[in-house]
């Protein structure tokens, strides 16, 4: 089964199966995994990287996805490629002679998912090829909010008009249309947390549970979710101040950005995340 994800940003690991170069790995960033592996195996003239050109075939073994934007994903890619240069990973031991490049970079990945800023992001670690799967060290398991997934993933573009719809809030859309009819241009939305007027729709979040009309400033809702952990900048989850349902921060951001394809599945199983608010630092 292929899982489709809207607003896709991922960082992947390739494994070389060419007998001449077998065991070599490559780490890269993509917004379209299916297209990217074809480019790598097609060579430079097909858009592949020069480091992988002429050394295929390559298998795309695993991918980390759920980044809020390309900048966050690219910074993650760089740190994974250069663990001993990144100030976030100075504690990671260097590769031993007995370690394969694949096992070493998997170990680096385990460390990365447990340190700031990445340990607060709503990431998914997905094994794309079952035959390469490794058991992660017991003491280096990802945070509980980061699921381990299996199987292929496909990037799906956000449909036109859905992004605007998401920022307004699906439940608020019909209500606001009625307000426009009744009040003309005098449509006023107030934050459910601070009760101040919401001036900019780009600065607001909306609950996606049916019947809930929550509107709140991003910062107000973030601070509410972080009341018990003020040392952090990025919330993981919290209770909707309007309907009382548990909300994953990443789901709220994906909903705001117009991603609806996997929200129904997420809200019921809590198996996938999406996040924003704070741009990752390297």
UniProtKB/Swiss-Prot annotation:
GO terms for molecular function: 5'-flap endonuclease activity; crossover junction DNA endonuclease activity; zinc ion binding. It is found in: Nucleus. InterPro entries: GIY-YIG_endonuc (IPR000305), GIY-YIG_endonuc_sf (IPR035901), Slx1 (IPR027520), SLX1_C (IPR048749), SLX1_endonuclease (IPR050381), Znf_RING/FYVE/PHD (IPR013083). Pfam families: GIY-YIG, SLX1_C. Forms a heterodimer with slx4. The gene is slx1a. GO terms for biological process: double-strand break repair via homologous recombination. A zinc finger (SLX1-type) spans 191-243. This is Structure-specific endonuclease subunit slx1. Catalytic subunit of the slx1-slx4 structure-specific endonuclease that resolves DNA secondary structures generated during DNA repair and recombination. Has endonuclease activity towards branched DNA substrates, introducing single-strand cuts in duplex DNA close to junctions with ss-DNA. Residues 7-97 form the GIY-YIG domain. Its main location: nucleus. Keywords: DNA damage, DNA recombination, DNA repair, Endonuclease, Hydrolase, Metal-binding, Nuclease, Nucleus, Zinc, Zinc-finger.
């Amino acid at each position: 089964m292929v899982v489709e994800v809207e607003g896709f940003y991922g960082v992947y690991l390739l494994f070389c199966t060419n007998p001449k170069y077998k065991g070599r790995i490559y780490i890269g960033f993509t917004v379209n995994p299916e297209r990217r592996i074809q480019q790598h195996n097609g060579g430079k003239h097909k858009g592949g990287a020069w480091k992988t050109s002429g050394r295929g075939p390559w298998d795309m073994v695993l991918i980390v996805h759920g980044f809020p934007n390309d900048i966050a994903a690219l910074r993650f890619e760089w740190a994974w490629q250069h663990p001993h240069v990144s100030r976030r990973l100075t504690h990671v031991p260097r590769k031993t002679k007995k370690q394969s490049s694949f096992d070493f970079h998997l170990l680096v990945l385990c460390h990365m998912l447990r340190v700031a800023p990445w340990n607060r992001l709503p990431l998914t670690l997905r094994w794309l090829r079952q035959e390469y799967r490794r058991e992660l060290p017991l003491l280096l398991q990802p945070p509980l909010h980061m699921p381990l997934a299996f199987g292929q993933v496909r990037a799906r573009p956000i449909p036109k008009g859905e992004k605007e719809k998401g920022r307004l809030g699906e439940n608020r859309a019909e209500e606001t249309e009625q307000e426009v009819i009744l009040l003309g241009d005098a449509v006023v939305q107030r934050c459910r947390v601070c009760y101040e007027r919401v001036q900019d729709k780009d600065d607001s979040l909306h609950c996606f549970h049916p019947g809930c009309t929550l509107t709140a400033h991003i910062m107000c809702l973030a601070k509410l979710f972080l009341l018990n952990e003020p040392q952090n900048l990025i919330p993981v989850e919290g209770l909707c101040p309007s309907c009382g349902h548990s909300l994953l921060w990443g789901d709220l951001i994906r909903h705001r950005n117009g991603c609806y394809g996997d929200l129904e599945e997420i809200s019921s199983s809590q198996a996938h995340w999406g996040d924003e608010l704070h741009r990752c630092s390297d």
